[in-house]
């Protein structure tokens, strides 16, 4: 039996449609076979209709789906909202699950068939608590930190509670604590600061920050053909 990781998909009113499209694309990338378990983390500003659309799309894509709703948060700082959703998810996971989880944001794109199994296998084949892209800040401090889209242990709230309470990006604030406990992987590619001509890494199975849907659209025909041939 292949090792499994929980897929955690957070979304707010601003990216609910993107989350729905991601679930549709995951089903296509998996050759129209339900795979894995998903936890939807719904922000308090999402209306019922959008929540239901994403839930239905997730139920098509995954073998099992759980849904939790975060209390509404009013703050102009985007980091605070992301930190809030992650805290709600991490606290719930610590109490309800025993498996590592992939924090999968709505602007992610699976790049290859079997992407989730490959991520799980690589994670369980390394000795550390976390795995994902490791980055370095560009300032003089050059802090090494784990990319937000990464695989986390189910009890990560123990290490992330304090960073999640700050105004900054929790993963950057937690860098000095988390980075030494993380294994760098090339399976997840981060393109948040790249242009649309970004070349997809041959080793990557998941890409983050396809905000315009450019890469997803490029891959759609390829996955459509593969799904028909299965």
Where in this protein do the model-derived segments appear?
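Acidic donor-binding/catalytic loop of UDP-sugar-dependent glycosyltransferases
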Residues: 106-122
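Short acidic, S/G/P-rich loop/turn micro-motifs used as interaction or catalytic elements
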Residues: 11-18, 46-49, 107-111, 156-159
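Phosphate/oxyanion-binding active-site loops and adjacent basic polyanion-contact surfaces
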Residues: 14-22, 75-86, 112
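Active-site-proximal specificity loops/subdomain of glycosyltransferases
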Residues: 42-98
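Short beta-strand-to-loop acidic/aromatic patch adjacent to the donor-nucleotide binding site
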Residues: 97-109
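Catalytic core and acceptor-binding pocket of nucleotide-sugar-dependent glycosyltransferases
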Residues: 110-113, 125-230
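Short, acidic, metal-binding catalytic loop of nucleotide-sugar glycosyltransferases
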Residues: 24-36, 61
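N-proximal low-complexity "stem/linker" segments adjacent to membrane-targeting elements
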Residues: 1-27
């Amino acid at each position: 039996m292949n090792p499994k990781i929980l897929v955690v998909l957070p979304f707010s009113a601003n990216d609910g449609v993107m989350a729905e499209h991601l679930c549709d694309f995951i089903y296509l990338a998996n050759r129209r076979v339900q795979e894995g378990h998903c936890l939807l983390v719904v922000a308090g500003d999402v209306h019922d209709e959008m929540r239901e659309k994403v839930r239905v799309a997730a139920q098509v894509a995954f073998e099992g789906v759980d849904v939790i709703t975060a209390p509404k948060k009013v703050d102009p700082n985007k980091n605070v909202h992301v930190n809030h959703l992650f805290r709600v998810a991490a606290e719930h996971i610590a109490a309800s699950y025993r498996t590592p989880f992939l924090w999968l944001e709505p602007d992610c794109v699976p790049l290859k068939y079997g992407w989730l199994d490959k991520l799980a296998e690589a994670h369980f084949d390394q000795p550390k608590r976390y795995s994902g892209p490791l980055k370095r800040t560009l300032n003089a401090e050059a802090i090494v930190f784990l990319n937000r889209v990464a695989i986390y242990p189910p009890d990560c709230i123990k290490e992330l509670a304090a960073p999640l309470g700050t105004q900054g990006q929790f993963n950057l604030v937690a860098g000095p604590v988390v980075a030494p406990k993380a294994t760098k992987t090339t399976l997840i590619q981060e393109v948040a600061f790249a242009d649309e001509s970004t070349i997809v890494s041959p080793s990557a199975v998941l890409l983050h920050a396809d905000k315009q849907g450019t890469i997803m659209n490029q891959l759609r025909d390829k996955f459509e053909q593969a799904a028909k041939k299965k």
